[in-house]
């Protein structure tokens, strides 16, 4: 019976003790290997960051060349200029600058109100029309 169990489980019986929390084989160089692995990871991360920074600097140089060629300003520069213009307009004012109202915007509303009132008066009987027109 013992033979059959050994054959069925194979070499798993040796690992069974480890899985259940038994004695593990300790590698004397495990700490050294872990330290080397951590150092390799740190170096790889530094190389990746350096490569990314170099690539981003090259891209920015190309972008700046295109901006210079076509006279395009950076978004930050445009925003700074717009902010400076807004501050220059409102230096003496305590409130924000008012938006310009296009001509004729408010005038049309009053005319429409009068025409609606006239239309309503037309449908009223004569004596009421006289009272409302006064």
UniProtKB/Swiss-Prot annotation:
Residues 29-69 form a coiled coil. This is Complexin-1. It comes from the Eukaryota. It comes from Homo sapiens. Keywords: Cell projection, Coiled coil, Cytoplasm, Disease variant, Epilepsy, Exocytosis, Neurotransmitter transport, Synapse, Transport. SUPFAM superfamilies: SNARE fusion complex (SSF58038). Positively regulates a late step in exocytosis of various cytoplasmic vesicles, such as synaptic vesicles and other secretory vesicles. Organizes the SNAREs into a cross-linked zigzag topology that, when interposed between the vesicle and plasma membranes, is incompatible with fusion, thereby preventing SNAREs from releasing neurotransmitters until an action potential arrives at the synapse. Also involved in glucose-induced secretion of insulin by pancreatic beta-cells. Essential for motor behavior. PANTHER family: COMPLEXIN, COMPLEXIN-1. Pfam families: Synaphin. The lineage of its organism: Eukaryota, Metazoa, Chordata, Craniata, Vertebrata. The keyword DNA repair does not apply. It is linked to Developmental and epileptic encephalopathy 63: A form of epileptic encephalopathy, a heterogeneous group of severe early-onset epilepsies characterized by refractory seizures, neurodevelopmental impairment, and poor prognosis. Development is normal prior to seizure onset, after which cognitive and motor delays become apparent. DEE63 is an autosomal recessive disease with onset in infancy. Binds to the SNARE core complex containing SNAP25, VAMP2 and STX1A.
